[in-house]
UniProtKB/Swiss-Prot annotation:
InterPro entries: Methyltransf_11, SAM-dependent_MTases_sf. GO terms for molecular function: S-adenosylmethionine-dependent methyltransferase activity. Belongs to the methyltransferase superfamily. GO terms for biological process: methylation. It is an enzyme of class 2 (transferase). It comes from Mycolicibacterium gilvum (strain PYR-GCK) (Mycobacterium gilvum (strain PYR-GCK)). This is Uncharacterized methyltransferase Mflv_0427. It holds the Pfam family Methyltransf_11. Its EC number is 2.1.1.-. Keywords: Methyltransferase, Transferase. The keyword Phosphoprotein does not apply.
């Protein structure tokens, strides 16, 4: 069975529209947005694991690189996994506490590009919407592969720069250039964007991600995260994928 066979059955247009409708609440109602994203991410990881290994994810250890404010911790724990979150920002770690129940895993303050874990120490290593926020995204990817055990899964998902959501809260102004978009946002709102181009937001392309993933020899699948199954072929079209694949998922299985 191919890694995406189970997920393909769930990748419907209604799912895509449901997730798209949640995006507009990212700033105004983060519980609604991140709660929906966390639930969908757990289901995606479960589908990928079961299709690849034929076994359940229950009692596996998942390392979430860029765990953020706790939504994923609760969702993965509720699904029966042992959750460990890595987060470099202490503010995000403190924000996680009210959103996680008492048994929702643990958090480690560290950088995703220098993970403080032994080689092959986790079953699943996940990074959701983090690679575009670090200056060395493929060093992050290499670290994810290093800590994932042979036969496990590393799932790296990131926002493609030239896609419609590449500018994050700066909107479509990122098509004018990242620095210009950040300055425009600052003039309009009186403060720098949280996702500030050149410091906390970087231009990461689909082509670069696919090139890196293929170079590892561990690539099991690549697909657009939020698209219905019939649109997954966009990933194979150079140029077009940069604009129409809003978020690329790279699934790697180290041996």
């Amino acid at each position: 069975m191919a890694a995406t066979d189970l997920l393909a059955g769930r990748a419907t247009l209604s799912r895509s529209l449901r997730l798209l409708s949640a995006f507009r609440f990212e700033q105004t109602d983060p519980d609604r947005f991140y709660g929906a994203l966390a639930s969908d991410t757990v289901a995606m990881v479960d589908d990928l694991w079961r299709a690849t290994t034929g076994t359940s994810t229950r009692n596996l250890t998942v390392l979430d690189v860029g765990g953020g404010p706790g939504y994923f911790a609760s969702a993965f724990t509720d699904a029966g996994l042992h959750y460990v979150g890595v987060e470099p920002d202490p503010g995000e770690m403190h924000a996680a506490a009210p959103r996680t129940h008492s048994r929702a895993g643990s958090f480690v303050r560290a950088s995703g590009t220098a993970l403080p874990f032994a080689d092959g120490s986790v079953d699943i290593c996940l990074s959701s919407n983090v690679a575009e926020h670090v200056a060395q995204p493929w060093r992050l990817g290499e670290e994810m592969l290093r800590v994932t055990r042979p036969g496990g899964l590393a799932v790296l998902s990131y926002t493609v720069w030239l896609g419609p959501f590449g500018g994050h809260e700066m909107g479509l102004s990122h098509y004018l250039g990242g620095y210009r978009a950040a300055e425009r946002y600052t003039r309009r709102h009186g403060h720098r964007p949280k996702n500030d181009y050149g410091s906390s937001l970087f231009a990461v392309s689909a082509a670069d991600g696919l090139r890196w993933a293929r170079s590892t020899g561990a690539l099991a699948a690549a697909f657009p995260r939020y698209h219905p199954r019939w649109a997954w072929g966009l990933t194979r079209v150079p140029g077009v994928r940069e604009f129409l694949v809003s978020n690329l998922v790279l699934v790697l299985r180290p041996t």
